[in-house]
Design a protein with these regions (language model features):
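Short, conserved clusters of charged catalytic residues that mark active-site
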Residues: 44, 128, 132, 272, ...
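Residue-level signal for alpha-helix termini/capping positions
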Residues: 69-70, 138, 282-285
């Protein structure tokens, strides 16, 4: 009797532990899925869960498979509820390509290209050795091209210079605007087939990153185009090596502290920068708005959610 009672108690403890583990995994998974709704300046943990969402997704799949094999109907109902709740965010993270919907004729359509060119690969452009990035942009067929990190070199043998950029692309894009934001930091450029009526830097708190708002006359209609390059995490190879070493050593506390110290300031910067851009969009009223660029964040991030609030995702 004592042995049977002990077995019963052990079984109950195991079930409780499994339930607690399931709730912890599912809770973290849902918090990561909806992390974009929580400002990092108020609570930073959801931002980290959103960043590591793929790992949480794998864990949630594992928990679901376990309860399928155990065939516990109550736990399976819980899993079904979790998947149903997270479905909208899964479609944000993994957008499904549906049949192309035509919103008008070919003449009415607008093709946008957003490209972080990383200083055009620091490679020059000549007739005998053309720059691959410039070639891609020229052949893209885009009506408007938003470029981030469009740093132009002073030496034509060390990279793309302003004169080369304009002369090579002028036939396709007669309207070109290049602005170095935040005291000469990252360079943002807009190449357009339509007249650029105004270009103004958006004052974002950052050392090198930034954003620019353009008013473009597209077929007689003014459109606000915002080219965004949000704060970078500035992760170096040595950082990755340190994190990997801490993970291998099983030093979870030091790994957590290292990640928090490195990533938290950027998450908070994204929060502030996204709010500024959101307010600008709202102040524009009911006019046409296009936002694109390098957000340096995930599709589930607060930055993506806040900037995109009230807009339609093109993906």
């Amino acid at each position: 009797m004592k042995l049977r009672a002990l077995f019963t108690i052990s079984s109950r403890i195991a079930r409780i532990l499994l339930l607690v583990g399931t709730l912890l995994v599912s809770g973290a998974y849902l918090l990561g899925a909806y992390s974009g709704y929580i400002p990092p300046v108020r609570w930073i943990i959801p931002a980290f869960l959103g960043l590591f969402f793929p790992a949480l997704l794998v864990a949630q799949i594992g928990v679901t498979i376990f309860w399928l094999l155990a065939w516990d109907k109550r736990r399976l109902l819980l899993m079904a509820a979790v998947w149903l709740i997270s479905l909208p965010q899964l479609l944000v993270y993994f957008p499904i390509s549906r049949a192309e919907k035509s919103l008008g004729t070919e003449e009415e359509s607008l093709r946008i290209l957003s490209y972080n060119v990383c200083a055009f690969g620091f490679k020059p452009h000549t007739k005998t050795s053309p720059n691959a990035t410039l070639q891609y942009i020229k052949s893209s067929g885009a009506d408007i091209v938003c470029i981030q990190e469009a740093m132009l070199n002073q030496n034509p043998w060390a990279g793309v210079v302003s004169k080369t950029l304009r002369s090579y692309l002028d036939e396709d894009y007669p309207y070109i605007n290049v602005i170095r934001v935040n005291r000469g930091g990252s360079t943002l450029a807009l190449l357009s087939k339509y007249p650029i009526k105004e270009a103004k830097e958006i004052p974002l708190p950052s050392w090198v990153n930034g954003a620019v708002a353009y008013k473009v006359d597209i077929r007689g209609k003014e459109t606000l185009v915002i080219n965004v390059h949000l704060e970078s995490f500035r992760l170096r190879r040595v950082d990755g090596e340190d994190y990997l070493r801490l993970a291998k050593d099983g030093d979870a506390i030091r790994l957590k502290d290292a990640l928090r110290a490195k990533l938290s300031p950027t998450f908070r910067s994204h929060n502030i920068q996204a709010n500024i851009i959101h307010d600008l969009i709202q102040s524009y009223g009911s006019g046409r708005v296009i936002v694109c660029g390098d957000f340096n964040d995930t599709p589930l991030s607060y930055a993506r959610y806040k900037i995109g609030e009230g807009l339609e995702d093109a993906f």
